Amino acid sequence: MGYQKLGVNTGHRKAMLRNLVTALFRDERINTTEARAREVRSIAEKLVTDAKQGDLAARRRALAYIYEEDVVRKLFDNIAPKYAGRQGGYTRIVKAGCRRGDAAGMVILELV
């Protein structure tokens, strides 16, 4: 499956997505553009599904992607158990109008 370039080079895109995923799990909601939210949603859903296993390998994979250790701890101790009975669909995208400067479509990405 492909990915969106998001108007930046590869290193910048990867770092930006890691930052957005870290912020999503830390704050449980983020405000961003629609294209970025769709990319972050895909990554976040996979990380939550992985965290539901709760094993050491899953924790190490999460630590390799998420920047902050306390956010990984929160993902495994608080967020993943909350979705134990749910098969996917851990996030929701709500449209939030357009950005003032360039009229980019803004959304709120939040954990359900």
From Swiss-Prot:
Residue runs in coiled coils: none
Gene3D superfamilies per UniProt: Ribosomal protein L17
Family classification: Belongs to the bacterial ribosomal protein bL17 family.
UniProt entry tagged with the keyword Ribonucleoprotein: yes
Name by which UniProt lists this protein: Large ribosomal subunit protein bL17
UniProtKB keywords: Ribonucleoprotein, Ribosomal protein
HAMAP family the UniProt entry points to: Ribosomal_bL17
UniProt organism field: Pelotomaculum thermopropionicum (strain DSM 13744 / JCM 10971 / SI)
